[in-house]
Amino acid sequence: MSAPIIDGKQISQDIRASIQQEVIRLKEHSFQPGLAVVLVGEDPASQVYVKNKEKACHDLGYYSEVHRLAADTSQEALLELVDKLNHQSTIHGILVQLPLPKHIHEKAVIDAIAVEKDVDGFHPVNVGNLVIGDDSLLPCTPAGVIELIKRAGVEIAGKHAVVIGRSNIVGKPVSLLLQRENATVTMCHSRTANIADLSRQADILVVAIGKANFIDASFVKPGAVVIDVGMNRLENGKLAGDVDFESVKQVSGPITPVPGGVGPMTITMLMQNTLVAAKRSHGLA
C-alpha cells in the first residue's frame, strides 16, 4: 500500500492565496510589500531561481526590483548596493542570490543586509534569534518543511525527528525548528555511525544531503513521515530527491515527492517573510 503524498504544489498555492488576500488588504493602507533580488554573474540555476522569484512577486502583487550585476562586480560595489536597498523605504526584503563569485565574501554580504530586511533568514542576528526561540525571519526552506508537516496533519510535539544533513541552510535550522515544535531531534551527517539504525527510529525523517536516492526503504520505520529536501539532476536530465521515492513510499507514512514537494514551498515562504517584514515596518505585525 502506497503512502499518502504531501502535495507541496497545492499547499504552496493555498498559502499564496492567503498572501494575495493580505496584500489586497495592505493596499488599503497605501503600501505594498517590496522585495529586491540581487544576482551577481550568470549562473544558469541562479538565473532560473531569480526569474521564479520575480514571477512570484508579480503574481502576488508585490513591488519588486531585480538587480543583475556582472560577474566581475567588486565586493565594495555590491555592499554599496545592499546599503542603498537597506535605506530604501519601498523595499522590505533583500535577497542576494547565492552562490556569489569567489572573489566576494558571502558572509560579509549577508552580514551587511539589514536584519529586518533579511528575508532569507541568514543574518547572524536572525540565526541567533532562531536558536533561542525568539521571533525572527525564518530560513525559507526549513520553514517550508515545518509547514508541510503541519499541513499534512502531523502532530510534531513528542515525536522523534531525525534530520540527515547538517548544512547551515537546511539541516541545522530545520532541527532547531523541530525542537521549537517540541520534537526530540537527532541530527545525522557524513561522520555519523549507523545512520540506517538511527534513521529507522524516526517518526519524522527529514533528508537534506544532496545524494540522489540515498535513502531507501531499509532506512525508514513503517508509517514514518518522510520529507525529502534533496534536489539532484540525474544523467538522464530528470530530477531526483535524496530519497528513493518508489521504494520508501511502500513503507512510509506521508511523504514528499521530488519535484513537487519541498521545492515549491521555498519561494512561497520567501514571499511570506517579505509580507511579515513589510507589515512590521508599518507597525502592523
Task: Give residue ranges: language-model regions.
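Short glycine-rich, flexible loops that bind phosphorylated cofactors or substrates
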Residues: K102-H103, N213-I215, L234-E235
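Rossmann-fold NAD(P)-binding glycine/threonine-rich loop
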Residues: K107-H123, V127, G230-H282
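Glycine-rich phosphate/diphosphate-binding loop of Rossmann-like nucleotide-binding domains
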Residues: V40-E54, S136-V225, K238-E246
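Short beta-strand elements in bilobed, periplasmic/extracellular small-molecule ligand-binding domains
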Residues: C57-D72, V185-M187
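Short glycine-/small-residue-rich Rossmann-like dinucleotide-binding loops
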Residues: P99, A208-K211, G230-M231
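Anion-binding alpha/beta catalytic cores of soluble intermediary-metabolism enzymes, centered on
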Residues: V96-I156
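Positively charged, low-complexity intrinsically disordered leader regions
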Residues: M1-F31
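Short, well-structured alpha-helical segments in soluble
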Residues: A77-S89
